[in-house]
C-alpha cells in the first residue's frame, strides 16, 4: 500500500525531474512551506551550493509581519529573494515548487519574485 508521504515524495521528484530537463544550467528557486513559515532559496545544482536564501524567520522581516504563514509573508519573502538574487548577479531561475500546488502562498512568492525582477 502506498502512503500519502510516498505520493508527495513522488510528486516532488517528478517536478524536479522536469526542472532538470528544462533548466539549461540556470539555478533553481526552491520553495519550502511549513505551517508556520515559508522559505525560499536559489540553488546552483551544477556546483551543489545555495546562492541566496530568504525566509520569514529573519529578524527584520519577522518583526514587520503579523504572521509568517500567510500570503503577505510569502509576498515579502518573494520580494526579498529577488532583491538578494539581483545583488548576487542572478537574473534567470527555474521555479521549483516541489510537491506544492501552484496556489496560495507558493503563487504569491512566485509573483513577488517576478515583480522583483527575477525571470522564470
Swiss-Prot record:
GO terms for biological process: translation. InterPro entries: Ribosomal_uL18_bac-type (IPR004389), Ribosomal_uL18_bac/euk (IPR005484). GO terms for molecular function: 5S rRNA binding; structural constituent of ribosome. GO terms for cellular component: cytosolic large ribosomal subunit. Keywords: Ribonucleoprotein, Ribosomal protein, RNA-binding, rRNA-binding. It comes from the Bacteria. It holds the Pfam family Ribosomal_L18p. Belongs to the universal ribosomal protein uL18 family. This is one of the proteins that bind and probably mediate the attachment of the 5S RNA into the large ribosomal subunit, where it forms part of the central protuberance. Part of the 50S ribosomal subunit; part of the 5S rRNA/L5/L18/L25 subcomplex. Contacts the 5S and 23S rRNAs. This is Large ribosomal subunit protein uL18.
Amino acid at each position: 500500500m502506498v502512503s500519502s508521504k510516498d505520493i508527495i515524495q513522488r510528486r516532488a521528484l517528478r517536478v524536479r525531474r522536469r526542472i532538470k530537463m528544462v533548466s539549461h544550467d540556470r539555478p533553481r528557486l526552491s520553495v519550502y512551506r511549513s505551517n508556520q513559515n515559508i522559505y525560499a532559496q536559489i540553488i546552483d545544482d551544477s556546483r551543489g551550493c545555495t546562492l541566496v536564501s530568504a525566509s520569514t524567520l529573519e529578524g527584520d522581516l519577522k518583526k514587520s509581519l503579523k504572521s509568517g504563514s500567510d500570503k503577505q509573508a510569502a509576498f515579502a519573502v518573494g520580494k526579498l529573494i529577488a532583491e538578494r538574487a539581483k545583488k548576487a548577479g542572478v537574473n534567470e531561475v527555474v521555479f521549483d515548487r516541489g510537491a506544492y500546488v501552484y496556489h496560495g502562498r507558493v503563487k504569491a512568492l512566485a509573483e513577488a519574485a517576478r515583480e522583483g525582477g527575477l525571470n522564470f
